[in-house]
Regions:
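Short gly/pro/ser/thr-enriched loop/turn and capping motifs at secondary-structure boundaries
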Residues: 88-90, 209, 264-267
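Bacterial N-terminal signal peptides that target proteins for export
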Residues: 1-8
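A metal-dependent hydrolase metal-coordination microenvironment
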Residues: 30, 34-199, 203, 236, ...
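Charged catalytic cores and adjacent phosphate/nucleic-acid-binding surfaces used
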Residues: 2, 22-52, 66-70, 132-140, ...
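Short glycine-enriched loops at secondary-structure junctions
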Residues: 123-126, 206-208, 263-264
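Prokaryotic Sec-type signal peptides and long signal-anchor helices
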Residues: 17-18, 109
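Bacterial N-terminal signal peptides
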Residues: 9-17
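Noncatalytic carbohydrate-binding groove/subsite architecture in carbohydrate-active enzymes
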Residues: 187, 195-223
Length: 415
């Protein structure tokens, strides 16, 4: 009887544990649904690393713990993640006080142990225009990018009255902290980041809160950063927004093209991965998976953005990627005809829209071909005479090498 009572108590304890416990500290329940995984093939001589270089957690104005960001990244198939908290804007500071601005990175790095995810240390320099918001990644110490001198409080309050920062409904302590931090010149914060060898990029230059017409424009401060070699990239894509003007700025000033989620809530809330949506990502073409190699690739501007169903990149980077994504194979001629069947395969998650620019026409398709991600299509081609080799040229309508210019690709196969 005593044994039965013990077993009953153990059963009750187990049940309570199941009811009250929601996973171990630092863990996230496993999701068996893999629909959100992003994949792109490597290019010749380099790895294609999938990254999100602008995200937030509760250590600034995000709403999840850093381990959630890590879990989301691994579920999406990301290789590289940066959690880039606002240095000057800290709306949760009363609830989550932390003096160390490296906290989010330390928590994320700990959560990523045992996975292949590379977590980069970074922060967001958060200022009024100019220069607006700028991310610095590969930092050694984020604290050195923040300067709070209480002697500047009177100046901070004076500036606060003049600036456009919206204080309505915001906690006064948070606003005062932001104002005081902004007295320290942005040039000093950017210089401090560069002293640590950071890769610095301009965030959401099209953001309507700082560019009322949504048009990205270089200010004199940005121009000087570029001239001095202190600004290395620019967001062409931020969340659901895209800037043609930022794309032009990048091309004209040799800045790396960056696309990010800038996620604050759950990724799944912003991008319904279960129905095929995805976060914007920056593809980085690196020699290996080390931080040193990733950093070298970014400084060499070897990036392509995947945004919605569009690939965006400079031609030197985008063409090799397309050559790895698209492959073609002949299955031979229909018996007694000059109609050739080929299989075109898409080796990536990106749906491609191809327009035929070759001298051949198709037997069962128009010149427009929809090539779904991770899939293949069959084409029947009227070659007019039997060939030993086939060459097709396509314009990729959703691959941009300039704001108004699509990429082209030539594919070959033996018959």
């Amino acid at each position: 009887m005593k044994k039965i009572r013990i077993l009953l108590w153990l059963s009750v304890l187990f049940l309570c544990s199941s009811v009250w416990s929601h996973g171990k500290v630092g863990s996230v329940a496993k999701d068996e649904n893999l629909n959100g995984i992003i994949n792109f093939p490597d290019v010749k001589g380099r790895l294609t690393l999938i990254s999100d270089l602008h995200t937030h957690s509760v250590f600034s104005d995000g709403h999840v713990w850093p381990n959630i960001r890590v879990s989301e990244a691994t579920r999406n198939g990301l290789d590289v993640l940066a959690i880039t908290e606002h240095l000057e804007y800290q709306p949760h500071i009363a609830q989550i006080p932390h003096k160390d601005r490296n906290s989010a990175f330390l928590e994320a790095n700990k959560a990523a142990k045992g996975s292949s995810l590379v977590v980069l240390a970074g922060s967001e320099i958060t200022r009024e225009m100019p220069p607006g918001h700028m991310n610095a990644i590969f930092l050694e110490d984020s604290n050195k990018l923040l300067n709070l001198d209480k002697k500047n409080q009177a100046e901070a309050q004076r500036r606060l009255k003049e600036q456009s920062f919206d204080v309505k409904g915001r906690d006064k302590n948070v606003v005062d902290f932001f104002a005081l931090a902004n007295v320290w010149p942005a040039e000093e914060a950017v210089a401090a980041a560069n002293e640590q060898g950071a890769f610095v990029f301009w965030n959401h230059p099209m953001w309507s809160s700082q560019a009322k017409d949504g048009v990205a424009r270089l200010t004199n401060m940005h121009k000087k950063f570029i001239t001095d070699g202190k600004l290395h990239g620019i967001e062409i894509v931020n969340g659901s927004t895209y800037s043609e003007e930022a794309f032009r700025i990048a091309i004209e000033n040799n800045l790396a093209l960056i696309g990010t989620s800038d996620v604050h809530n759950l990724i799944e809330w912003d991008y319904l991965t279960r129905i095929g949506e995805h976060r914007p990502v920056t593809l980085i073409f690196a020699k290996d998976r080390s931080k040193e190699s990733i950093k070298e690739a970014l400084f060499q501007r070897r990036t392509v953005i995947w945004f919605k169903e569009i690939l965006i990149g400079k031609e030197d980077n985008l063409l090799p990627l397309l050559e790895s994504i698209i492959s073609i194979e002949s299955t031979g001629y229909d018996k007694g005809t000059q109609i050739l069947t080929v299989i075109i395969k898409n080796n990536s998650s990106a749906r491609l829209q191809l327009k035929n620019q070759s001298r051949f026409t198709f037997f069962d398709s128009t010149n427009l071909i929809d090539l779904p991600g991770n899939d293949k299509v069959k084409l029947r081609i009227k070659t007019l005479k039997k060939l030993d080799n086939l060459q097709l040229e396509f314009e990729v309508l959703n691959a941009l090498i300039a704001p108004d210019k699509n990429s082209r690709i030539i594919v070959n196969t033996k018959i």
